[in-house]
Amino acid sequence: MEAIAMAPRPKTKGLPPGTLIKVGKFAWTQMWHLMMARLAPRSQSGAYQRPASQFRQWVGSEAYPAEAHRYSLIVGMGCPWAHRTLVVRSLKGLEDAIAVVRAQPSPDQGMWVFEDEWEGCQTLPELYQVAQPGYTGRATVPVLWDSQTRTIVNNESAEMIVMLNGAFNAIAAHASLDLYPDDLKETIDTWNEQIYHAVNNGVYRCGFAQTQAAYEEACSELFAMLDQLDQVLTHQRYLGGDRLTLADVRLFTTLFRFDIVYYSLFKCNRRRIQDYPALGPYLRDLYQMPGVAATCDLQAVKRDYYGNLFPLNPGGIIPIGPDITLDAPHHRESLAQRSLVEE
């Protein structure tokens, strides 16, 4: 039987491996810089620059009196800035007076969207348009929303937690708890300024840096401040001494996310918080305060960072770990004599 001759298979034509790598690297680098420019504005040196918040009104003014069931907090559970407001709301006992509306980041739309339609809006940018038609700035969380005037009162978390601490005392279950007392304001403000630059925003300056020099500068400042904080907290329970303050709240929401996402995703990997002799127990101490753990959503944090920051994690794979036990004993009770809520 005559054999059938098979035609030789044509060679696959394509770019040589070296050229393919160069082309792919160039295309991805250009796309990365384009996406990072939208995600994280930068200076000429490649350092991340956080845009200022635009809505800066205050509850307690004539236009916005403190009233129960009038205001809502719009938050994202993964966001550390929004988390601050949830912690203070819980510590002050304002759960029945101020509602919480959850939004979540959409990886496809690149914006915050509501879990359910709210105030006639499906996305946060739509709500910003309701508050200020023609608004062209960033639509961020947290938001303090006034249902009576249908507008945004404030979207700056640093100011919102001051309002939540003091403006709503008439309707707060824990009105006696003062997280921003007059005799500690100077100390609190000093800590807030240092912690914001080096830690709260510092982790973002590491993760969103677009040059090696900008990253190394931010990382050095971050860990220098963490080392300083660890030394201070070796001898006192809180940053204000024996009293919990807003400075602790502002630090807590970054520390809670540190080992989970900032250590790996943002390349803040010189040392974990749980490895610090004072900062690790301090984090557990704050987490175990009444009402605080209920504001923490570990899975949302991992989902929102790893699943939505495409330029930093293009594959969108969410890690299983790390295993962190924040319910473990902290042994810091002996460092303070004053109770959290003075009756």
Predicted regions and their residues:
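C-terminal alpha-helical interaction module
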Residues: 1-343
